[in-house]
Each structure stands twice: as structure tokens, then as C-alpha cells.
Amino acid sequence: MGDRIARPHARSYVTLLAGCCVTAAVALPARTAPAASELPAAAGPLDAAAAARFAALALKCLHQEYPNHLSHTLSSDSDARPPHELTPAFYGCLDWHSDVHGHWLLVRLIRLFPDAPFVTEARTALARSLTPQNIAGEIAYLRGAGRASFERPYGLAWLLRLAAELRGSDDADARGWSATLAPLESEVAARLTSYLPRLHYPVRIGEHDQTAFALALIWDWAAVSGDVRMRDALQDAAQRFYLHDRNCPLAYEPSGEDFLSPCLAEADFMRRVLSPPVFAQWLSGFLPQIPRSTASTAAAPAWLPPGVVTDRADPKLAHIDGLNLSRAWMLEGIAHALPPHDPRLPALNAAAQAHADAALPAVTGEHYEGGHWLGTFAVYLTSQAGLPGTR
């Protein structure tokens, strides 16, 4: 895979969808709602002060080896080694996937705030991790016996999102790190391309194994890398898993330890795959409970209230802060894909804002249970990383 961004391969399912969605089509009333571009971002723009706070969270844990939660298969006594020997590039931030997306956080913030005071330290941290020797060690670990499903799909998807962020940067250091990461990027992409056709059912939970969220991250990588095989595998997965879904039970969410919404993550993936008019029609059948209203009547998100966090020192209960952050960006992404005067926009944007308001003040690092990962979710939201046309 070269360094230059390639034109993404696309294949349309418009004809196919026209038949499957006709029963879900709803004539939109002739009422005027604000265009998505006229409504405020769910969290407001990411400013330098917030960027510095979030960068500090990643810098604190990127090479902090302990505590460490290993997802590690041992085949012999020789596999009982410390994390920095097992996965020498990504061994901090409690677990592999959090360390990977902590690297993504720093790469993105360097890209957005190249002159910020934290950038020097961030470059040093990234250079420490992303060396040819460390990446070779990561590949060797992945290829070890019993590790075919290691960090699949969540951590692997974040690895590709890190690769995409490096590919999209014109920074000289980022170009070098991209080249260094490329062998691991290829290894991960090949694993996922092989895995998706063998996955017969999507995983519809609210934690790491969820399929839809990972597919969205992988889709964005495929758009940057120009990987045609991956794009085809993702489009096939969208058709098999989600195209005919109806009436997603949003009222059953969240489960007590969710950090992803199964319903919203699916919609956030499908808005990437489908054309805007077809997505708007599909969404009517998939989430018919989204209110249709004017801006003045959509202020209270009673249809989707933010999740309640009872104990931020509990590593599982603290997931709900992440749920609120990811819901906010998914709602924003869904709104972004709808027509400018769609009457669902006010409700979607009001709910996105309410979730962001509930979660962002909690991204402080007071408790390592959330501090090792919530910064990434805050940056993904506030920098609008999942929206088309953003840097």
C-alpha cells in the first residue's frame, strides 16, 4: 500500500434497496428544519485547551505498563512474559486497544494543533512506540499460536484508524510513522478481509465485540487507503447483516456496561455505505421512533436520554460515559447524512448535544478506569473525526 491517498472504490446498492425499503418509506412533511450545517456540533469545536487536556491523558498512559489487562493466550511457559515484551509498540493504557487508540489521539491532535505545547512530547512518545523493531514484534505476536481472534474486531479496527490518520497527514513525522506501521497495517487488513466473509451473524452487543462500530472505523480506513477488497467485503457485510433490519429496539438500550449503542452504531455505519436518499429511507424503517418535529419542540431528548453513570471508579460502570460520547457522535453522523430539511434533524441534534453535555465533563482522568480511554472518545467526538470532509 502506497503513501498516496487513492480514490475509494464504490459500489451502489440503490437498486437493491429500492425494493427492500419500499414498505418503510415515509413521505416527509413539508416542514422546514435547519440544515445539518446550520445546527451546532454536538460538543462544539475542539479548542487548544481541550486538546491539551485530552493529549495529557494519552501521554500519561501510553507507556504506563501497569496495571495491565491482558487478552493473552499462552501456549507454553515461554509465553508468560511482561506486556512490553509481548506487544512492544502497544503495551500501555491498561490494554492493547486503548494504547492503540491513544496513539491515534496523539496523531490526530498533532495534525489539528501542530504548534501546541504538547506536540513535542507527543512526537517523542509516538517515535518511541512506532519503530521497525517494535512493529515487527507486534506482527510476530499476532502470528503466534492461538491468536487468530486477538483484538478482533475492536482493537484491529482502531489499528486501521490509526493507520488512516497517519496516511491523511502531510506531517513529515507522520509519513515516516505511516511507512513504519505499514507491515502491521497490511497484516491487520488481511486478517479482517478474511474474517468478514466467514462471520455469518453480526455481533450486536454494546462492548468491544460489536460488529457495526468496527465496520465504521474500517470503512473510513478503506476510503483513505483505497483498499478495494476491504471495501467490497464491507459492502457485502452491510447487505448481509443490516440492509433488511427494521424497528431496532432502542428502548432496550443501554445494557449496564455498554459503551457503544448497537442501534446507533449500525445506523452510523450504514450512513457511510448508502447514498443519502436511500439512507434516509432505510432509517425510517430501522429507527422509526426518532421524533419528527420542528426545532422548537425537539429540545428535550426524552426519546433517548443520556445514560447514567453511578460509579466512575468502576471499570465496567464507567463504560456509560463512553456510551454517551459515542452516542453523541453517532447521532451527529446520522444527522449529517440526512437531507437538509429532514424533520428528524432537530431531535437527533438535540439528543447529540445532551449526550455530549453529560459526558464531556467526566473526561478528567480522575480515575484510571476511564482516564486510560475516554480521551480518545472525546477527541473523536469533538474533532468530528467520523464525519466526511473533516481534516
Feature-to-residue mapping (PLM):
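Bacterial N-terminal signal peptides
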Residues: 14-25
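Low-complexity, Ser/Thr/Pro/Gly-enriched N-terminal "stalk/linker" regions
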Residues: 38-91
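Short, low-complexity intrinsically disordered segments enriched in A/P/G/S/L with frequent Arg
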Residues: 2-11
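Long, repeat-rich segments with strong aromatic
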Residues: 223-373
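Solvent-exposed loop and edge beta-strand segments that line ligand/cofactor-binding
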Residues: 42-48, 83-100, 140-156, 198-211, ...
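Well-ordered alpha-helical scaffold segments within catalytic/enzyme domains
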Residues: 39-46, 60, 100-116, 157-173, ...
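Extended ligand-binding groove/face enriched in aromatic
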Residues: 100, 109-225
